[in-house]
A protein has these predicted regions:
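Catalytic cores and adjacent flexible loops of soluble metabolic enzymes
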Residues: 1-191
Length: 191
């Protein structure tokens, strides 16, 4: 599989610097993190985009969620995301610096927004490995997909693999452990 100018697979390693939402909603910090990724030798930087109204229930977004944990997390997600224009600026900055910009869309409307950026590939979060409607929407872009498998059972992974194969999608699975730091007995790199 190819992503941009990079051929993915043996013997080549494709290094993705996971920025996610660690920029805390600051465009300046996001750009500084891109520079740090370049200095570290990364091939790609990866961000996240979500349309909060598409992903979360209105009740939760209106601060009427059933628990404080949900309210706390949603508040952080809202405060720590970049706007569409800021994502576009980061993508353009990456192009000017010679590093690939990639993003994890959490919903179909984010996919549609990101398609305007002409990004080379999409990353699917572990939490969305079984979100077949989202994956189907991503497949229609004809872009390569990198899908994380954290928290998924072998049968869930197989369902998604069969789904992608049936659609002749270009994809790779990214072995992912969703516990940080991961206990050695959970690493399972030989699967």
């Amino acid at each position: 599989m190819k992503i941009g100018k990079f051929k993915i697979g043996k013997p080549n390693v494709f290094v993705i610097a996971e920025i996610g939402n660690n920029h805390n909603g600051s465009l300046q910090l996001a750009l500084e993190m891109v520079d740090a990724a370049i200095d570290a030798g990364a091939d790609c930087v990866k961000f996240q985009m979500r349309n909060m109204a598409s992903v979360y229930r209105k009740k939760s977004l209106d601060k009427q969620g059933e628990d404080l944990g949900t309210e706390y997390i949603l508040d952080l997600l809202q405060r720590f995301q970049l706007s569409t224009d800021e994502h576009r600026e980061v993508a353009e900055y990456c192009t000017s610096k010679g590093i690939l910009y990639m993003c994890t869309p959490w919903d179909s409307s984010s996919v549609d927004t990101l398609e305007k950026f002409k990004i080379p590939a999409y990353k699917v979060a572990s939490a969305d490995l079984t979100n077949l409607p989202l994956i189907d929407h991503l497949v229609t872009t004809k872009k390569p997909l990198i899908l994380s498998t954290g928290m998924s059972t072998e049968s869930e992974i197989q369902v998604t693999v069969d789904f992608l194969n049936k659609r002749e999608a270009s994809y790779v699975l990214l072995h992912c452990n969703s516990t940080y730091p991961a206990p050695f007995h959970d690493i399972n790199l030989n699967w």
